[in-house]
Structures are given as C-alpha cells and as structure tokens.
C-alpha cells in the first residue's frame, strides 16, 4: 500500500488578536525558506490565492503562509453593524467595528503564531493596504513590502473613491445570487469575470474551480465587506514607510485605477513600480512568473539584518 501523499497545506491554525481568531495555513513545500505572508483582499478568503502561484513562490525560496482577514473566511466575523453597503461605509466619519490598526495587528498575530520574528509581506487589493499599515506600525517585523492592486494605505473614507472605478462598483451592486453554496460559487465566478483583464480570454474553468474550493459567502457578504472597508487608519502617512517596497498593479485593473499604484510608488521613499500588462484586479496564471520574480528580486535587495530580527 503506497503512503498517502503529503498535503499541500498545513492544518488550519488559529492566531489570536484579542477576541478575534484568525485562520491561517502554511505551504508544506520549502517550509525552511524565507518567511512570506500573503494578505488577501476585500471579501476574499485565503483560498482565493492560487495554489500554483504559492508553489511558485516556494520554488523561489519562500516559506509561504496565508490567512483570512477578520470578517473573512474561517476567521472571526464581527456582529452586524448599521452600514450594510461597502460604498456607504466610505461615507462614514469613523469605522463602526474596528480600526485599520486592528487589521494590521492581525497580520502580526499570525506571524507570531507561525513563530516568525519577521517576514516578507505580499498584500493584494485590501491586503495591500493592510500590508502597508503593518510596515508602518511594525517596521521591524517586515523584511520587504510588496503591495499589489492596492490604494495608498493612509487613505480611507471618501478619499478612497478617487482611486476606484465607480462603474465597476455599479456592476457589483447589480449582481444577485442565492444565499446558498451554489450561489456563492456563481457569485465568485461573476466577480472573477468582472475583475479580469478584458485583453485576455477569461478562464471560466479556473474561476469556477477556485470558487468551488471555497464556496463561502465572502464575495457577497456586504455587511462584512462594509466593516472591512470602513476600518480607518490613524497612523502616519505612507511617506514614513522605511522597508524596501515594490508596487505592482495591473495595467487593465477594472476596479482600482493604476494611478493608485503610481501614487504609492511616488510617495514611498525608494519604492519601485511595476505595471503588469494584460492583468486586471487578479493574480492570473500568465503573470505568476513575473510577479514571483519581482518579489524575489525585492527580497534579494534586503537580507534580514538585526533590525528585521528584533521584535517591536
């Protein structure tokens, strides 16, 4: 009898930040590599980060872990609040449930649970803004910062709207699917289609497979998304970022304007901007090699020194 194959991912772990429990897992391949934590986007759980992309990062020398943001996936979901629409949450003067600082501290709690003193960060969409805030709030815990398809980490509320394509938000608002596992899969496919580059054939089979692996309600749980997007930042501006920074943005991003990436790169000292051709608000397979190579090149510019090894 042949032995069972080794699972690709570790069993789900739970990190704690106060009353919030954060679900995370770790790629079993190259577990002895350089720590790299992947931060996910609005309404997306960790399973939306493609396995193949994570394995490619591992082959580049990284120990890859990912986690569900609070109010996403298997992490703690907070009680309902008055605001039920993510766009409406941008108009509020203060967040109703938690702060952006809380979300930054979540990432550090996951790192602590993994036993990592410091890590490279790769944040996508909302995760990119959270990653910037982690680097501002806990610079000694961050080796390098890669932000992809994100807005500047020090903006919130109405200031966010200047970076968002409102026509795409309107299309999201018109999506209607049953509140069932099957409806969640269809919602995931529809969202993936809206966020893909129009200059590349949409891979519906891949989108359906990804949605089928994680048919939770995140993609159409507007209350949870409202709490996430309503979390406000009270810390320093991104000009204070001191970690080596790479800014990635799809040239065809239909949700966050590429100008957002240009602003981040201009404002963060020493940051480098890479615009990805034929890429939308997504991590498509044709771009995996380029993204992984850029993250590796950034890491090679900053070997972990004493500052990176110390705790705050």
Positions of predicted regions on the chain:
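Short beta-strand/loop motif that positions the catalytic acidic residue
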Residues: 241, 247-249
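Acidic catalytic loop of the alpha/beta-hydrolase fold
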Residues: 252-256
């Amino acid at each position: 009898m042949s032995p069972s194959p080794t699972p690709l991912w570790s069993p789900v772990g739970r990190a704690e930040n106060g009353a919030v429990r954060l679900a995370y897992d770790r790629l079993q391949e190259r577990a002895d590599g350089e720590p790299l934590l992947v931060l996910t986007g609005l309404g997306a759980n960790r399973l939306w980060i493609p396995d193949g992309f994570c394995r490619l990062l591992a082959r580049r020398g990284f120990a890859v872990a990912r986690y569900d943001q609070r109010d996403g996936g298997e992490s703690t979901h907070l009680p309902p609040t008055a605001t039920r629409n993510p766009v409406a949450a941008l108009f509020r003067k203060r967040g109703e449930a938690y702060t952006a600082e809380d979300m930054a501290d979540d990432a550090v709690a996951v790192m602590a649970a993994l036993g990592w003193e410091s890590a490279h960060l790769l944040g996508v969409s909302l995760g990119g803004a959270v990653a910037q805030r982690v680097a501002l709030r806990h610079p000694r815990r961050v080796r390098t910062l890669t932000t992809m398809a994100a807005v500047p980490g020090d903006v919130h509320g109405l200031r966010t709207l200047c970076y968002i394509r409102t026509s795409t938000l309107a299309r999201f608002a018109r999506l209607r699917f049953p509140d069932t596992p099957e409806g969640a899969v269809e919602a995931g496919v529809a969202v993936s289609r809206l966020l893909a580059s129009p200059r590349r054939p949409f891979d519906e089979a891949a989108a359906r497979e990804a949605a089928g692996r994680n048919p939770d309600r995140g993609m159409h749980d507007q209350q949870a998304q409202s709490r996430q997007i309503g979390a406000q930042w009270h810390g320093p501006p991104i000009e204070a970022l001191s970690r080596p920074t790479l800014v990635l943005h799809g040239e065809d991003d239909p949700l966050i304007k590429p100008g957002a990436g240009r602003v981040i790169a201009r404002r963060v000292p020493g940051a480098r901007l890479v615009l990805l051709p034929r890429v939308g608000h997504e991590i498509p397979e044709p771009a995996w090699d380029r993204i992984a190579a850029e993250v590796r090149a950034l890491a090679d510019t900053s070997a972990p020194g004493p500052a990176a090894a110390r705790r705050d």
